């Protein structure tokens, strides 16, 4: 639902990347993962990624059921994936490499650094394709796109006290904000944000965002995690909070909104002969 969402019943946010030791990831995300479903069907399920991700809250919430194979270099990613595929007649293996995303955040999409990193990703895909057992199907894709945000496009909520009136918690991220209202203030909060941002952002109530399919099918138990108001910037606007979120506010590349550059991703298919 978002990078940072409210913990129902508590006046604090859960950051999905940093997690919170007080929150059990199995309860936070109770549905069977694709790895658990694969294993239940007799298919070997393996996830290959950086060793630092082993056992994190996000990994347990989304990747549990997978045989976690740590790999801290591109060469190791390709080798671990190939080994996992050779070990079983039927296998579902995912490989995650996050450096292209990190480079985009730091330097921007289309920067020299980003294109250099993209060349490394292309080489990784080539190595994976060359190591696949016959009949193996490979899909190379991404979990999101990205847009570049200039300093002039950063709208700092910390400098607009009128937009914080009635706001209990500012969640989400600069390109996908969840606004949690104080009791009875949701309607006024929605009106204030719409008036200030105008056509620079899509600003909807929780109910309208759900009706419009922003979050796909929403289980009733998850509804309260969504902001009372949600704001998705159009164009290259970013809704930052330089005091509360200095690190996120300083990024060059961002994602999370509804623009094609953020929602459309490549899907390259290959079947080994």
Spans of features found by a protein language model:
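Feature captures the catalytic ectodomains and active-site-proximal regions of enzymes
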Residues: 1-273
């Amino acid at each position: 639902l978002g990078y940072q969402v409210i913990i129902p019943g508590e006046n604090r946010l859960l950051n999905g990347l940093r997690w919170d030791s007080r929150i059990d990831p199995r309860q936070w995300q109770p549905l069977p993962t694709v790895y658990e479903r694969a294993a239940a069907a007799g298919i070997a399920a393996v996830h290959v990624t950086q060793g630092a991700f082993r056992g994190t809250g996000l990994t347990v919430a989304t990747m549990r059921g997978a045989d976690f194979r740590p790999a801290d270099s591109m060469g190791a990613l390709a080798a671990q994936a190939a080994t996992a595929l050779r070990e079983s007649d039927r296998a579902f293996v995912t490989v995650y490499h996050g450096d292209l995303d990190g480079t985009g955040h730091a330097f921007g999409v289309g920067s020299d650094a980003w294109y250099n990193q993209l060349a490394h990703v292309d080489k990784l895909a080539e190595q994976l394709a060359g190591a696949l057992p016959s009949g193996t199907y490979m899909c190379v894709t991404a979990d999101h796109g990205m847009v570049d945000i200039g300093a002039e496009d950063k709208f700092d909520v910390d400098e607009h006290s009128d937009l914080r009136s009635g706001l209990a918690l500012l969640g989400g991220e600069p390109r996908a904000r969840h606004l949690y209202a104080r009791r009875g203030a949701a309607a006024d909060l929605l009106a204030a944000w719409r008036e200030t941002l105008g056509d620079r952002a899509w600003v909807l109530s929780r109910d309208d965002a759900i009706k419009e399919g922003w979050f796909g099918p929403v289980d009733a138990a998850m509804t309260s995690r969504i902001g009372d108001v949600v704001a998705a910037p159009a164009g290259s606007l970013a809704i930052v909070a330089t005091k509360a979120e200095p690190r996120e506010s300083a990024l060059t590349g961002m994602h999370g909104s509804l623009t094609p550059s953020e929602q459309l991703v490549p899907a390259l298919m290959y079947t080994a002969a």
